[in-house]
Amino acid sequence: MLSQKNSSITSVLERTKNTTLNDQQLAELAIELARELLIASSHEMKLSERYYLWKMNRMMDDTLGKAFTLAMADKVFRPISHTRSADQFRFLLDEYGVPSYLPLHEKIAMRIGAAASILVPQIVMPVVTSKMRSESSDVILPSEDNQLKPHLLKRRKSNTRMNINQLGEAILGEEEAGRRLQQVIDRLESPECEYVSVKISSIYSQVNLVAYDQTLEEIKERLRLLYRSAKKHQFTHQDGKKSPKFVNLDMEEYRDLYLTCDVFKEVLSEEEFMQMRAGIVLQAYLPDAFEVQKDLTEWAKNRDSNGGAGIKIRIVKGANLAMESVEASIHDWPQATYYNKLDVDANYKRMIEYGCLPEHAEVVNIGVASHNLFEVSYALLLRAKHGVDEYVEFEMLEGMANHQARALQKAAGGLLRYAPVVKKEDFHSAISYLVRRLDENTSEENFLHDLFGMKPGCPLWDKQKKMFLDSCAKKDTVQSTPNRIQNRETEEHVVDYLSAFENAVDTDWSLRHNQNWALKHVRDFDEKEIPIIPLVINSETFTTETLGTSRDPSRN
């Protein structure tokens, strides 16, 4: 049965190769292919995965259970004190009740644990934490070598590549940033490691967009260290060939978008790194992302024409929507992201389509990062249509819908898994990642939310199919200009004395023209001649020829 399904998938892809299918035909074929992938995924499913899907499907219909699970991940596992953790555990049970989606034996264990935590929290809470760590061990891997290395070797034998992202404490100072940088370098030195992801905010703690140029130079120096390590400690492939290890620059906040791109381009334009192949992530939920993709593509083509190596862009939809919404609200800015999922999905398709064009893909390889089988199918067909199979790679999160990942790997001829890793003592630092994944997977419009109970032709399938077709229809017209356009250089302030009070909007330092505006004022002040300030005593003004020298403490 499974070989028949693989044959069906191959047949659909073969029908697409070197054709001139229009958008409508491509969308219809993508739906057919997604159906075949979903069926193939179900045949790939192991017993343990069926149990997990059964549990997750029940959670989708348990509103209080979802809220309890999110709150528990956020509140119970952070405190160092077992007594404090136990208090939070019991409080959440009183607030939400035992989740109804849990099987009976887990409900009983939770009640017993809550009662026992009153008397012996130092015994109960480590057990609860251990259970949580165990259940999330497929999603967040242990970074200790004796546990991580066997897993990497296992994945390698199954022709699965691994992209490692080191999680840890929040980077609040340069000491912690230095430790994180060294952790990534240590990982690159490991023979089993082929590919790492790192954010600029995890290797430099003092990102200051007002001091843009100084920040840029600091981050460039640290990125050079990573690239040098990647070049020095080459990865040995299964066929015996060696290549530099791959460093991927991750994205997080909108404010980091242009800074990350500038760091990436400037370092890779240096003679030392012209032959370095490296990657960067773009988030499709940002309207700016498509224009940034085009800019990176033109830069990469120029670099290639000057003898440089190609690059890779990993295209994701974005996982920090809640944070972007909160920041916009606090500062009274427009939200940096699109305001609805339809536009996000449309932009994602537009970016994949642009990236799959042969004249682009050869120099700028594409990483299609998605668990949405409709999106994956669309990209598979575009890849086949343009004959760019070797330049377009598919990526999924480690531990998420593994049966689906195996089916895709067979269809695509390979797979890259994004794998966060964390030390046992730093597990609490991975909670934010877990909460984001839980929030994302339980969001009503998310594909994984519906996957847990989806079959071809069911209402959940029809819902996701409609969303896919709607976004296909909009991909060529969706907005590609940024939402945040504040410009302190050109704006005019109009005061309306008859209107109600409205606070001034904070300056958005992520915008280059606002950075230049601030820099101009600083330079103007530097060149300004400070007048002599007289003493005023009893309404009389006193001046003197005697002058003193003082030091401005803000200038070292």
Each model region followed by its residue ranges:
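Glycine-rich phosphate/pyrophosphate-binding loop
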Residues: I485-E540
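Glycine-rich loop-to-alpha-helix module at the N-terminal edge of alpha/beta enzyme cores
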Residues: L535-N556
